[in-house]
């Protein structure tokens, strides 16, 4: 006779195809917790950035958790992929500093712009345009995007703990930070520990490292302190003003605002699409043609999350590259994403706990994932010289410009021009050329973020 737990495990396994994809329920939950810890910083960073632009931080905190929670749960249930949704940091910065502070657009109009961006983004996804872009993504550029994102993660993590800093002097743009600081030492030691644990195939090695460093930080770092467990979420500021449903769609249709909406859409299309492709590839969730399994559902969920963001008062949403931390921990199904979503909904009431995980506890995980993504170099076909070089150009300029879309644009342009100059124009397809022209025009017109 089967026990209730066995039946539960069986139903989970059947729904999420856990065994079929070579995983276990425990492995998926650990992967989800790993991803959550790697991206929980967003509930602090996003309210802080939008708060500088006049958004009520407490209300933004709630909205950020709702977007990440519900978006990730839908991704898991519908697309069955280990991809976590959250408010995109780059698009949050654009919303706060360019739209509101730079163009002096009101908060309701900015939220209307986010909503319109989400609607256009969803139309592009639902009509198959995003899938078409993925089908016309050259192999070199696709693998180069994965390499570039890996390098980008390494730079983000190293800069976040002060290992690499902006050069205060003339010369190169970056410089070595203070190597002897506690965050830097903990990050590098943590990276080495993760590598050792992964070599030994210790289950949940990344998660154990994050928890271990957090405990060390709580003991020795005065900036990490226990301030309680529970806190009731607030949907409005101290004056009772709520962001939910406060968007001004008609204001966002103003000709002055529309170019910014289109810039958000173009950036999201290529940034998020490249991220989803890279993380799915890292998790071996591509079919025999190199396309994402149930990719259409993932792309639509990703875009619809931005519609929800505009309604509840948050920044545009996107799949987080930190999802790769979960796939590195073994996540292969939507149960990973659902775990992330449930944890974000719980953190609504446990917000003090989010401050117990310092940046230097998650930095080693991001560094390790970045290193893993560099393995995409081995997937590049160097027998096709132009395609291979375009891929490497994509990778290098993603990290040099700190912008995924810019790297993809330069990679596409390099491929098309390289094919023409080398006499290999017959290898080009119309889709690749159209995307290259669209991206170059987007940048030449000054609309890029």
Curated annotation (Swiss-Prot):
This is Guanine/hypoxanthine permease GhxP. Residues 50-59, 98-109, 163-180, 223-254, 313-314, 350-360 are periplasmic. Residues 1-25, 79-80, 130-141, 199-202, 284-296, 331-334, 381-385, 422-449 are cytoplasmic. GO terms for cellular component: plasma membrane. The chain crosses the membrane at residues 26-49, 60-78, 81-97, 110-129, 142-162, 181-198, 203-222, 255-283, 297-312, 315-330, 335-349, 361-380. Belongs to the nucleobase:cation symporter-2 (NCS2) (TC 2.A.40) family. Azg-like subfamily. Disulfide bonds: none annotated.
């Amino acid at each position: 006779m089967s026990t209730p737990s066995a039946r539960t495990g069986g139903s989970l396994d059947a729904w999420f195809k856990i065994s079929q994809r070579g995983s276990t329920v425990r492995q998926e939950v650990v992967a989800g917790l790993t991803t959550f810890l790697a991206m929980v910083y967003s509930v602090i960073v996003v309210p802080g950035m939008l708060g500088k632009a006049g958004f009520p931080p407490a209300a933004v905190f709630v909205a950020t958790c709702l977007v990440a929670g519900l978006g990730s749960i839908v991704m898991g249930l519908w697309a069955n992929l280990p991809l976590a949704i959250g408010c995109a940091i780059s698009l949050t910065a654009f919303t706060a500093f360019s739209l509101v502070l730079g163009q002096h657009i009101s908060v309701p109009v900015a939220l209307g712009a986010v909503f319109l961006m989400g609607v256009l983004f969803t139309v592009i996804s639902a009509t198959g345009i995003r899938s078409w872009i993925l089908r016309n993504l050259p192999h070199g550029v696709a693998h180069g995007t994965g390499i570039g994102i890996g390098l980008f993660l390494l730079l983000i993590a190293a800069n976040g703990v002060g290992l690499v800093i902006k050069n205060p002097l003339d010369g190169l743009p970056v410089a070595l930070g203070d190597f002897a600081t506690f965050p830097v030492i903990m990050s590098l030691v943590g990276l080495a520990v993760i590598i050792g644990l992964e070599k030994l195939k210790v289950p949940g090695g990344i998660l154990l490292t994050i928890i271990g460093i957090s405990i060390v930080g709580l003991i020795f770092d005065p900036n990490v302190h226990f301030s309680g467990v529970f806190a009731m979420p607030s949907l409005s500021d101290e004056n009772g003003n709520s962001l939910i449903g406060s968007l001004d769609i008609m204001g966002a249709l103003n000709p002055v605002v529309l170019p910014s909406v289109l810039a958000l859409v173009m950036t999201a299309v290529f940034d998020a699409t490249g991220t989803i492709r890279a993380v799915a590839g890292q998790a071996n969730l591509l079919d025999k043609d190199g396309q994402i399994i149930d990719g259409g559902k993932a792309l639509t969920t990703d875009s619809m999350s931005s519609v929800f963001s505009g309604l509840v008062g948050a920044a545009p949403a996107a799949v987080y590259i930190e999802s790769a931390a979960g796939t590195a921990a073994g996540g292969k199904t939507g149960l990973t994403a659902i775990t992330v979503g449930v944890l974000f909904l719980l953190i609504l009431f446990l917000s003090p706990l989010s401050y117990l995980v310092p940046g230097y506890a998650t930095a080693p995980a991001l560094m390790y994932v970045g290193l893993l993504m560099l393995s995409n170099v081995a997937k590049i076909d160097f027998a096709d010289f132009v395609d291979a070089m375009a891929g490497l150009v994509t990778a290098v300029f993603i990290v040099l410009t700190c912008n995924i879309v810019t790297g993809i644009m330069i990679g596409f342009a390099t491929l098309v021009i390289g094919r023409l100059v080398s006499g290999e124009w017959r290898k080009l397809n119309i889709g690749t050329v159209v995307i290259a022209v669209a991206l170059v025009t987007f940048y030449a017109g000054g609309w890029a973020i």
